[in-house]
């Protein structure tokens, strides 16, 4: 039987969710099993593998797929999908996140050493991350434009790089680079400028019945194995047909 989550507690101290056997159980240990058929019956959106580099893999995450799980389980997450479908199979470690409602490039590490090396690059802000967003209206300020409004009391920096016309004259597509990775940073900064992202029900027009039109289109970092700079890009296909769906 597959469980949504499995925990082990030792001497009244909670440990992390148990994914694989790491030690023998002892007298007094307690296993806590959480099973929810509604969760396990869900079919995750299918991501596309951009490259399998062995120590890490790069994916095109679709709308609706979680980056990682919660304390209750990791069904319908990119981390779990990569563990189940990559061959040869190997563990997966999260090094950054992408909103469930967004789509685009994500990087997954498969070794502890590569996870540490990649995580340190994100922490040092040396990873280049570009996003394309279909927004309401046009950004009226001169570009490039730096937005530095703090998010949840923490420093946050976004750079609006460029803008192009969308098919709908009431909309435009902007390219955004971020130096920090705060929660919903691109969404919140664009909404602050008066140009909320199409389909953003949290910071934009709540009645819109389309997916969040936000896509991670460029990811550049140093390969932890070779030490060489690697760059991955996806096409900016926003501004045409939007897709009906669900957002956070």
Spans of features found by a protein language model:
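RNA pseudouridine synthases
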Residues: 1-248
